[in-house]
C-alpha cells in the first residue's frame, strides 16, 4: 500500500520539484515539434 502511494505522489523531500515533474512528460512532444519545425525550415529535403 505504501508503494502505491509513493508512485502516485512524490515524497516530501521532492515537493519543490513537483511543477517540474508535471512538465516532464511533455518534453518528448516538444522534440517531435522541434523535428517538424526543423524539417520545415530546410523545406522537407
UniProtKB/Swiss-Prot annotation:
Gene Ontology BP terms: photosynthesis
Bilayer-spanning residue ranges: 20-40
UniProt keyword terms in alphabetical order: Chloroplast, Membrane, Photosynthesis, Photosystem II, Plastid, Reaction center, Thylakoid, Transmembrane, Transmembrane helix
Location, primary (coarse class): plastid
One Pfam family per UniProt: PsbK
Entry GO terms, CC: chloroplast thylakoid membrane; photosystem II reaction center
Prosegment residue ranges: 1-8
Topology of this chain in the membrane: Single-pass membrane protein
Compartment(s) where it occurs, according to its Swiss-Prot or TrEMBL record: Plastid, Chloroplast thylakoid membrane
Subunit structure of this chain's protein: PSII is composed of 1 copy each of membrane proteins PsbA, PsbB, PsbC, PsbD, PsbE, PsbF, PsbH, PsbI, PsbJ, PsbK, PsbL, PsbM, PsbT, PsbX, PsbY, PsbZ, Psb30/Ycf12, at least 3 peripheral proteins of the oxygen-evolving complex and a large number of cofactors. It forms dimeric complexes.
Family: Belongs to the PsbK family.
Described function: One of the components of the core complex of photosystem II (PSII). PSII is a light-driven water:plastoquinone oxidoreductase that uses light energy to abstract electrons from H(2)O, generating O(2) and a proton gradient subsequently used for ATP formation. It consists of a core antenna complex that captures photons, and an electron transfer chain that converts photonic excitation into a charge separation.
Name of the protein in its database record: Photosystem II reaction center protein K
Chain's gene name: psbK
Amino acid at each position: 500500500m505504501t508503494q502505491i502511494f509513493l508512485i502516485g505522489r512524490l515524497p516530501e523531500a521532492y515537493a519543490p520539484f513537483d511543477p517540474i515533474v508535471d512538465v516532464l512528460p511533455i518534453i518528448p512532444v516538444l522534440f517531435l515539434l522541434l523535428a517538424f519545425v526543423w524539417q520545415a525550415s530546410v523545406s522537407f529535403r
